């Protein structure tokens, strides 16, 4: 059984709400009389990445996942989808220094809303070289008997409440690290992934040429595996090989402990992950997922996947979830500093 999910300042995702505007620190050196010695204020020392990773709070991850699953369904065709949109905006809007934007699209008459949290350096970021961490927040239960997307529950705790919760926690952690950033980090909460990544593909299609992104890192369905702390590392074309290698190195460098971490080359959009449209367009892109493929000796299959039974109690490997969250954030921070 398959176990996996399944598109300058960018033309501006439509501004939906804005937290406090990114501040510009005053110059450290001011004019002074010739007889006065002026001492520059040293730049704050960046917190080591290993220390930043320890700020990820497993309890907060769990709280967000449980809240997202409690809405019943986040399927874009279900009226409860709006509750998830409101929750994400409320949580992000409560974090000082985070700028929220939205990008709206439609697929076969189904409205989609992508939500972005911009984490900027304290000085204006460059127009290119941005780093995206993305997760889809929609859900589906099409493997359940009698499935009707407008009324059937689709709690999506593992797929992809785990990845969405990680992005919310990144926003909290990264808002305190802006002084160490040289590049903008964009946390992208994509809609319509379960419709074959329609939200991310639409956003990609809205980007200018050249697009602003240097890398896309996708975290999707990372909370179940009773056998091993395994992740599949999906990468796209040779243009993503260096990013793939950076993820592998980060797992070792910060002693995160994902084992095994298994690279898989994706050559088509058949990998229904939000990294796919970006990677196939030539943007360095990877995705981490608990398994993309059939069951094997390190993954037994997830029977709750895409059913009404993907509930919080099925997210049983919190250790793997935390490791996936750390690995994703470590890679993004290395790129953005």
Model-derived features with residue positions:
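Second-shell loop/turn segments in exported
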Residues: 47-55, 69-80, 101-106, 148-160, ...
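A non-catalytic alpha/beta surface segment that caps or lines the substrate-entry region
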Residues: 63-122, 261
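Bacterial signal peptide processing site
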Residues: 6-9
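C-terminal motif of bacterial Sec signal peptides marking the signal peptidase cleavage site
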Residues: 2-4
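Active-site-adjacent substrate-binding region
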Residues: 226-337
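Acidic/histidine-rich catalytic neighborhood of metal-dependent amide-processing enzymes
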Residues: 111, 151-239, 246
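Structural recognition of the beta-strand scaffold that forms the well-ordered cores
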Residues: 60-69, 101-102, 116-118, 130-134, ...
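N-terminal hydrophobic or amphipathic helices/low-complexity stretches enriched
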Residues: 26-79, 128, 297
